[in-house]
Amino acid sequence: MDPIRKPAWLQKKITPAAHAEMEGLLKELRLNTVCQQARCPNITECFGKRQATFLILGRICTRLCSFCSVSKETPLPLEPGEAASVAEAVKRLGLSHVVITSPTRDDLSDGGASVYAETVARIRSVSPRTKVELLIPDFRGERAALAAVVESAPDILGHNLETVPRLYSIRSGADYQRSLDLLAQARRMAPDLNTKSGLMLGLGEEEAELYAVMEDLLKAGCGYLSLGQYLAPSRMHHPVQRYVEPELFEKYKEKALAMGFEHVESAPYVRSSYHAENYLEVKSPPPEGEG
């Protein structure tokens, strides 16, 4: 089947020249970003603003999700000093909000949880005012791994459901209920923790299925939600079933807020970490003299 042609609202220009400074720093510190590995369409905008989502635990994933462009090979050993390098990048870039994520590392005994925790600690030691957001894998449902991450006290803990239960065959090795349980368990461990999840649209989901997932997330205590258009990285990946109109993204945002989510980012180019700093603004106290 031939791929569906992209509509006009999804024509976004990527300017490699705008990446030079950021890519130079990443190369110097031997760091990876999901922006590069996942071929994010927002890379020019974010790199131009000196923003990036750091990819720890290497560039190779142990799962075979059919929608993702991250490499699937034999994972390499962990990079010594990676957490310190991420912290150094955060400090040098002067980031007020940083997002840390990783490929799934089922080959590691704790799934990489200890590296997440160390990275948070390192960032806090050199840039204590920086808000730290983690976007974690499911750690195979291991409670001890999740506890190690929660105890590091990130400002936001994210875990993406990605799609509706009926389409979970595209998530190799994942389980819808396990992912929901992870979010719920994190809130039980730390009741004040801000939790977040994201969904890709255009994979073949129905509107009623989308709303059912929103209900499940709210029941799991998840207050933040991102909704964005799925874009197939290549013809070898899961094909796009539909390009969702911007008006529908706005409708879904209004519905999600009415259902009880605290903050929602919903638009064709929204990704998990896109405008990540906006989520915590709803929690910020008003300036003195206001409110």
UniProtKB/Swiss-Prot annotation:
CDD domains: Radical_SAM
Positions contributing to [4Fe-4S] cluster 2 binding: C61, C65, C68
Predominant location: cytoplasm
Cofactor: [4Fe-4S] cluster
Keyword Metal-binding: yes
EC numbers, comma separated: 2.8.1.8
GO cellular component terms listed in the entry, alphabetical order: cytoplasm
Chain positions recorded as [4Fe-4S] cluster 1 binding sites: C35, C40, C46, S273
Catalytic activity entry: [[Fe-S] cluster scaffold protein carrying a second [4Fe-4S](2+) cluster] + N(6)-octanoyl-L-lysyl-[protein] + 2 oxidized [2Fe-2S]-[ferredoxin] + 2 S-adenosyl-L-methionine + 4 H(+) = [[Fe-S] cluster scaffold protein] + N(6)-[(R)-dihydrolipoyl]-L-lysyl-[protein] + 4 Fe(3+) + 2 hydrogen sulfide + 2 5'-deoxyadenosine + 2 L-methionine + 2 reduced [2Fe-2S]-[ferredoxin]
InterPro entries: Aldolase_TIM (IPR013785), Elp3/MiaA/NifB-like_rSAM (IPR006638), Lipoyl_synth (IPR003698), rSAM (IPR007197)
Name of the top EC class for this enzyme: transferase
Domain Radical SAM core: 47-262
Similarity annotation: Belongs to the radical SAM superfamily. Lipoyl synthase family.
Protein localization: Cytoplasm
Keyword Transferase found: yes
Organism annotation: Geobacter sp. (strain M21)
Gene: lipA
Associated pathway: Protein modification; protein lipoylation via endogenous pathway; protein N(6)-(lipoyl)lysine from octanoyl-[acyl-carrier-protein]: step 2/2
Cofactor binding, note field: Binds 2 [4Fe-4S] clusters per subunit. One cluster is coordinated with 3 cysteines and an exchangeable S-adenosyl-L-methionine.
Any one GO MF annotation of this record: 4 iron, 4 sulfur cluster binding
Disulfide bond residue pairs: none
Protein name: Lipoyl synthase
Keywords on record: 4Fe-4S, Cytoplasm, Iron, Iron-sulfur, Metal-binding, S-adenosyl-L-methionine, Transferase
